[in-house]
């Protein structure tokens, strides 16, 4: 493939191992330190880039308070020891924050506003409770169902609309853990994980090399015994078929093709298309469908042209309707979340967008795939999609 000078290319990507939020390996590690150490590792393996050449650092984070407040991106940049001349901004599109950071960087490169961007995101859900200090306007109830603020209830509603059974959800949840465990055992995450110091059960410092969240022994039978998590009377969504509450950070180094060539850095993929969409907040999990359809149309592609898909697993009850309406259910075993997803790895809000896009690139390299889609739903009714093409 021949690249044009202003094509947007991903040169490298990395993430921390995912940690459980409740008494997990990062319980004594701050969100800004998680990110700063990750950035240090990513830049160290791209030594041809002088960090002073970074035009902007764009970092996703949802719960922007405490250690994640006061423009955490700038705090991370300073903590990582990057030149003070490099600017930084924190973005918040809820679950889609770091993918939105990627899109902003890509749009800037296409427009000629810059050549080098460091993007990513973080969420320490163990330190910053997602349910505290949230004060939705009561007047929203005039135009939006009050239950739309409960992501679990929106997943319940979506599953009812699409006839998704409890059995199908449990099978999907078990698959996520099985695929993630297999990927770990086979070293498939080695490209993307940068090990870091955390703490073991006794509180002793230890090097965290793998995701703490995966449960290899998860079975459909075990999941079938769990009680509903959001609707105790007749509900089907359980903790076992929901994305885990976790701590983590992810990052990508994004450039114009011209700058990558100038620095002698080899691109992994180029951004082929990007799209956003809105949906009724009551079915917020459906957002990936219109977002992906829009991204495909913008690129002149069909879903059949796509080799690999990473869909953020907010809930099995949400993922299955999306796959159904994108005509991916029959192709799931060959194309979708082949290294597991957020049910096994977790969904640290600000981190997940570049996390799933990085994992997509890992899968594409292993499968020698050409075209890939990363997509996710977003709380309160949005969807975001990125289409990448390997170079």
Swiss-Prot record:
Alphabetical list of InterPro entries matching this protein: FadA, Thiolase, Thiolase-like, Thiolase-like_sf_Thiolase, Thiolase_acyl_enz_int_AS, Thiolase_C, Thiolase_CS, Thiolase_N
EC number, as in UniProt: 2.3.1.16
Record has Cytoplasm as a keyword: yes
Entries under Gene3D superfamilies matching the protein: 3.40.47.10
Active-site residues from the entry: 95, 347, 377
DNA-binding is among the record's keywords: no
Enzyme class name: transferase
Pathways per UniProt: Lipid metabolism; fatty acid beta-oxidation
SUPFAM superfamilies reported for this sequence: Thiolase-like
Pfam families: Thiolase_C (PF02803), Thiolase_N (PF00108)
Reactions that this protein is recorded to catalyse: an acyl-CoA + acetyl-CoA = a 3-oxoacyl-CoA + CoA
This protein's GO CC annotations: cytoplasm
Location of this chain's protein in the cell: Cytoplasm
Keywords noted in UniProt: Acyltransferase, Cytoplasm, Fatty acid metabolism, Lipid degradation, Lipid metabolism, Transferase
Highest taxon in the source lineage: Bacteria
Record's function text: Catalyzes the final step of fatty acid oxidation in which acetyl-CoA is released and the CoA ester of a fatty acid two carbons shorter is formed.
Quaternary state and interactors: Heterotetramer of two alpha chains (FadB) and two beta chains (FadA).
Family designation: Belongs to the thiolase-like superfamily. Thiolase family.
Record HAMAP family: FadA (MF_01620)
PANTHER family (alphabetical): 3-KETOACYL-COA THIOLASE FADA, 3-KETOACYL-COA THIOLASE, PEROXISOMAL
Name under which the protein is recorded: 3-ketoacyl-CoA thiolase
Lineage: Bacteria, Pseudomonadati, Pseudomonadota, Gammaproteobacteria, Cellvibrionales
Gene: fadA
């Amino acid at each position: 493939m021949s690249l044009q000078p202003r094509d947007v290319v991903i040169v490298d990507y990395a993430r921390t191992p995912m940690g459980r939020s409740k008494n997990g390996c990062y319980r004594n590690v701050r969100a800004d330190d998680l990110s700063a150490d990750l950035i240090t590792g990513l830049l160290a393996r791209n030594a041809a880039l002088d960090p002073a050449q970074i035009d902007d650092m764009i970092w996703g984070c949802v719960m922007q308070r405490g250690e994640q407040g006061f423009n955490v991106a700038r705090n991370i940049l300073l903590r990582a020891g990057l030149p003070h001349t490099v600017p930084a901004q924190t973005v918040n599109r809820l679950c889609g924050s770091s993918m939105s950071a990627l899109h902003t960087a890509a749009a800037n490169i296409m427009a000629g506003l810059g050549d080098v961007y460091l993007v990513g995101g973080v969420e320490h859900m163990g330190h910053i409770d997602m349910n505290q200090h949230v004060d939705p306007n009561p007047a929203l109830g005039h135009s939006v169902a009050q239950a739309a603020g409960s992501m679990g209830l929106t997943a319940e509603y979506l599953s009812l609309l699409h006839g998704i059974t409890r059995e199908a959800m449990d099978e999907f949840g078990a698959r996520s853990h099985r695929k993630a465990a297999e990927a770990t055992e086979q070293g498939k995450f080695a490209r993307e994980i940068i090990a870091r110091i955390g703490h073991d059960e006794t509180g002793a410092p230890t090097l965290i090399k793998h995701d703490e969240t995966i449960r290899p022994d998860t079975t459909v039978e075990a999941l079938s015994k769990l009680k509903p998590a959001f609707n105790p009377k007749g509900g089907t969504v359980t903790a076992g078929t929901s994305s885990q509450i976790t701590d983590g950070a992810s990052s990508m180094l994004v450039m114009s093709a011209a700058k990558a060539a100038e620095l002698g850095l080899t691109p992994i993929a180029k951004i082929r298309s990007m799209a956003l969409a809105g949906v009724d907040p009551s079915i917020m999990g459906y957002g990936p469908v219109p977002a992906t359809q829009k991204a495909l149309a913008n690129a002149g592609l069909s879903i059949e042209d796509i080799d690999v898909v990473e869909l953020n697993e907010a809930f099995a009850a949400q993922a299955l309707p999306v796959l159904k309406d994108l005509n991916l259910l029959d192709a799931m075993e060959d194309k979708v979340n082949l290294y597991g997803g957020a049910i096994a790895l977790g969904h640290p809000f600000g981190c997940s967008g570049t996390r799933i896009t990085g994992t997509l690139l890992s899968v594409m390299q292993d499968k020698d795939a050409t075209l890939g889609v990363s997509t996710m739903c977003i709380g309160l009714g949005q969807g975001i999609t990125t289409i990448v093409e390997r170079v």
